[in-house]
């Protein structure tokens, strides 16, 4: 079953956007990942094969930065600390860097699965379907 998302519908409606944006911002603030210098895509689980493939496709510097952010956040968590407010991830820095790559990987996998499940039937030719007069007795 495909998960239902209302995001596109909400983004198209100025009223709903205006209504829900403060709630969204409050949720992001309460989740606290920006206080550790993380981006939203840093929170994605890596145990998934698709995510692993997407991570391998990231540019080297983006991958390095991701690992650095995660390790720094883990260290801060162990020490029960957060970053100084000046070092928190700013909203404009919190963009999706992994999701587009992951969407591409998933689309490729689904296409491959559909292609692998494809059944090719060889059409019968007219020559084989009717018997030739030479063979008729």
From Swiss-Prot:
The keyword Membrane is assigned to this record: yes
Protein localization: Mitochondrion inner membrane
Keyword Membrane: yes
SUPFAM superfamilies associated with the record: 14 kDa protein of cytochrome bc1 complex (Ubiquinol-cytochrome c reductase)
InterPro entries the UniProt entry points to: QCR7 (IPR003197), QCR7_sf (IPR036544)
Pfam families (alphabetical): UCR_14kD (PF02271)
Main location: mitochondrion
Membrane topology: Peripheral membrane protein
Biological process according to GO: mitochondrial electron transport, ubiquinol to cytochrome c; proton transmembrane transport
Keywords of this entry: Electron transport, Membrane, Mitochondrion, Mitochondrion inner membrane, Respiratory chain, Transport
One GO cellular component term: mitochondrial inner membrane
Subunit structure comment from the entry: Component of the ubiquinol-cytochrome c oxidoreductase (cytochrome b-c1 complex, complex III, CIII), a multisubunit enzyme composed of 3 respiratory subunits cytochrome b, cytochrome c1 and Rieske protein, 2 core protein subunits, and additional low-molecular weight protein subunits. The complex exists as an obligatory dimer and forms supercomplexes (SCs) in the inner mitochondrial membrane with cytochrome c oxidase (complex IV, CIV).
Role description: Component of the ubiquinol-cytochrome c oxidoreductase, a multisubunit transmembrane complex that is part of the mitochondrial electron transport chain which drives oxidative phosphorylation.
Homology family: Belongs to the UQCRB/QCR7 family.
Name assigned to this protein: Cytochrome b-c1 complex subunit 7
């Amino acid at each position: 079953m495909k998960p239902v998302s209302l995001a596109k519908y909400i983004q198209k409606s100025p009223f709903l956007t205006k209504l829900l944006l403060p709630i969204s911002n409050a949720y992001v603030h309460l989740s606290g990942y920006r206080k550790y210098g993380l981006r939203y895509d840093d929170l994605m689980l890596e145990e998934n094969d698709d995510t692993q493939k997407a991570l391998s496709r990231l540019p080297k510097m983006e991958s390095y930065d991701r690992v650095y952010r995660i390790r720094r956040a883990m260290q801060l968590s162990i020490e029960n600390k957060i970053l100084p407010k000046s070092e928190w991830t700013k909203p404009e820095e919190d963009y999706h860097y992994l999701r587009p790559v992951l969407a591409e990987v998933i689309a490729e996998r689904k296409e491959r699965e559909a292609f692998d499940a494809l059944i090719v039937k060889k059409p019968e030719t007219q020559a084989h379907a009717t018997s030739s007069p030479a063979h008729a007795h």
